[in-house]
């Protein structure tokens, strides 16, 4: 879950993307209630584009019980989704990583498509 603090605009990301969003505790920060039943663990709050905590948690899980594959969805394809897909591919190179394009969106349709192509070039399987 994309998570920022009230001082977001003072961060490197905030200076380059000066659009306050996903501020902890505000409307729009929480994952939609309709998805609660599908969750098996608490959400991981990620304060940057890619989550090293997500990668570490999945690596630990994989070491205990082999992960067959990972599917990513979300916003923004061209920022957070691609960052996490590449991070997971580097952390778990033998686990197939999928991105379901129907459940992703980029800043623009063009940047969405460019991100999907970049992920495909890095052996991430894009479901179209």
What is each model feature region?
Residues 1:
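Short, solvent-exposed turn/loop segments enriched in Gly/Ser/Thr/Pro and often Arg
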């Amino acid at each position: 879950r994309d998570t920022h603090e009230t001082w977001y605009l003072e961060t490197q990301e905030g200076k380059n993307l000066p659009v306050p969003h996903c501020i902890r505790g505000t409307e729009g920060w929480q994952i939609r209630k309709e998805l609660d039943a599908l969750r098996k663990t608490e959400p991981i709050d990620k304060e940057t584009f890619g989550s090293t905590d997500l990668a570490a948690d999945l690596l630990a899980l994989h070491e205990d019980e082999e992960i067959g594959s990972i599917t990513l969805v979300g916003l923004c394809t061209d920022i957070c989704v691609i960052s996490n897909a590449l991070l997971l591919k580097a952390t778990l190179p033998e686990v197939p990583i999928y991105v379901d394009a129907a459940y992703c969106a980029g800043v623009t349709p063009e940047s969405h498509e460019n991100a999907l192509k970049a992920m495909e070039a890095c052996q991430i399987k894009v479901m179209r």
